[in-house]
Amino acid sequence: DCSSRGLGDVYKRQLFTNGILNINTKELLPFDREMHFTQQLPYDYKPELECEPIIKWLKKTQDGNWDRVQVLRAWLRAVLLSHSDIQKFVEIVGPGKSGKSTYANLAHALVGDDNAMISSLEHLEKNRFETANLYKKKLLLFNDVERYGGSVSVLKAITGRDLIRNERKFQSGSQKPFKFNGLVMITANEPIQTTDPTSGLARRRLTIPFD
């Protein structure tokens, strides 16, 4: 996340532990003090590594459905590059031991602990301090969501890239609101149900079954 050059440049450069990767050219550049990053991926960039084992596993979880495999791969790329401009959240739905938690763990490992946040829908909607924890994160993860029938106003604001509160507990003075530049992932046994009467949530939801 290259804060000095605006959101568009986030998609072009990523900071690794061994240099700065130009996403378009795949060229690994040396560290540059003129580039100010707010996030770093916690591992080296190694172009010689292959992703075939992951692709093979994804094909297994999707019963060979290549289109869904490609969507899952594209989502991981979107998380890695902070493509919040798509204004979507992914909902991975399936029974236990179907691979949905493994996929969520893969996304978490891809960005690293410092760039991810784990929460619950109830906590996000009812705790006014929770949104502040999203600042400079790439991934907001809701694991194994049980039956939920409450408000999703904060979730809609986050995925719609609206300004959200930056209120921090035990800190006086107001902090500037910010836009969440990461993506949201939900894993559950069934699609979440909410009290939202509009189409705002439905058009942002991308449900992928893990059967």
Language model features: what each stretch is:
Residues K138-R161, T194-L201:
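Conserved AAA+/SF3 P-loop NTPase catalytic/coupling segment centered on the Walker-B
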Residues F16-N18, F180-P197:
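Catalytic nucleotidyl-transfer cores of nucleotide-processing enzymes
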